[in-house]
């Protein structure tokens, strides 16, 4: 009804590092809910607003750069400060995907290190024993397929009492983690749509990582595998979004 739509109209800030990495499927759901969306394209020189209190939630997306590349991408310095302010000081809801996951991990005291090996493809995620108690991921199956496309990962969060590990893959421990009960790092790509893989394959850094990992011509196979699993991945994205809305 009209009434619930207006009452649900939240202010969301979306931080992007390359224009083709958006909240994707979740973006469509937010638009259907008439959310007020502010997108900041950092790689094009846009700045994160200084008044973060106006936002109910923050999405921080992926990108071809890495967290340590502050010399090449000086805006990373301010971005980390703003994430720290939003998550630690203001204690507001945050979803970080891939690079956005790594930025959260670094901000709360973890290390971002090279993945050995990189994870690229449609791969398995296994949830931790405690995940059913989590108010965002409790609708997920205990294991599921997810799209991975990363060469770095978060480590060394074990000693942070505010961090809960929620999901891992065979080679990456911190696939899903949360800081307290409002900020989530998600290393894989839950937000993908039908055209995501073919679009991302046009980014030189992504194409190189893909071919280094899976060989020449891997994009087509990867895309087909993604299409086979798309329905399930979209259901997971929808469940994540429905639950995330409740904490906004």
Language-model segments: residues:
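Short, glycine/charged-enriched secondary-structure capping and boundary segments
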Residues: 27-29, 55, 72-75, 108-112, ...
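A short acidic, often aromatic-flanked loop/helix-cap motif at beta-alpha or helix-coil junctions
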Residues: 44-48, 120, 154, 173-174
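Conserved beta-strand segments of alpha/beta enzyme cores
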Residues: 36-38, 111, 145, 164
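N-terminal beta1-alpha1 cap of cysteine-dependent amidohydrolase-like domains
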Residues: 1-89, 214-248
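Amide-donor transfer/coupling interface in amidating biosynthetic enzymes
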Residues: 127-248
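Cysteine-nucleophile active-site neighborhood
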Residues: 60-131
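Short glycine-/acidic-enriched loop or helix-start segments at secondary-structure transitions
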Residues: 23-25, 49, 69-71, 104-107, ...
């Amino acid at each position: 009804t009209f009434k619930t739509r207006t009452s649900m109209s939240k202010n969301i800030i979306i931080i992007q590092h390359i224009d083709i990495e958006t909240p994707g499927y979740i973006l469509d759901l937010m638009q259907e809910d008439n959310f007020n969306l502010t997108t900041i394209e950092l790689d094009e020189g846009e700045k994160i607003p200084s008044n973060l209190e106006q936002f109910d939630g923050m999405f921080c997306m992926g990108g071809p750069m890495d967290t340590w590349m502050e010399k090449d991408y000086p805006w990373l310095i301010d971005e980390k400060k703003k994430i720290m302010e939003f998550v630690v000081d203001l204690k507001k809801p945050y979803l970080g995907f891939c690079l956005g996951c790594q930025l959260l991990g670094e901000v709360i005291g973890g290390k971002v290190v090279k993945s050995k090996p990189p994870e690229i493809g449609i791969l398995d995620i296994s949830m931790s024993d405690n995940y059913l108690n989590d108010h965002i991921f409790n609708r997920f199956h205990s294991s599921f397929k997810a799209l991975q496309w990363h060469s770095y990962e978060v480590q060394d969060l074990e000693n942070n009492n505010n961090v809960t590990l929620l999901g891992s893959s065979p080679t990456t421990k911190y696939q899903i983690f949360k800081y307290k009960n409002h900020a989530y790092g998600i290393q894989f790509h839950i937000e993908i749509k039908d055209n995501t893989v073919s679009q991302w394959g046009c980014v030189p850094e992504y194409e190189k990582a893909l071919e280094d990992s899976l060989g020449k011509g891997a994009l087509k196979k990867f895309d087909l595998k993604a299409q086979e699993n798309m329905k399930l991945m979209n259901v997971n994205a929808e469940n994540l979004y429905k639950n995330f809305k409740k904490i906004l």
